[in-house]
Amino acid sequence: MGFVYRGFLLRSKSIQLVESNRWTLQVVVSIHKDSGSEPREQTFSSENFFSSKEMADMEGIIFARKIIDGEIPGLSIDLL
């Protein structure tokens, strides 16, 4: 599932940890810079754990929005 935020497409790709049945978030942020070109994308992850895929997906989108807004030190979309 994807969400658009400030012109960026955000896609959550949560990962289940087999050894603990918990989930960790991974989110892909992409943007089309030029019409007809391939999208540029960057993947971000966190070391936080969640009890369900739904929670990890929701937190992944929130995490990506914070990265776009410059609220997560050390992470940015400047390379896109």
Give the ranges of each region predicted by the language model.
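N-terminal segment of the canonical double-stranded RNA-binding domain
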Residues: 1-34
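A mid-sequence interfacial segment
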Residues: 1-3, 34-43, 78-80
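Contiguous segments within soluble domain cores/interaction surfaces
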Residues: 6, 18-20, 38-43, 70
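Residues in flexible loops and secondary-structure boundaries
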Residues: 9, 13, 18-20, 37, ...
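Acidic, low-complexity intrinsically disordered segments
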Residues: 43-80
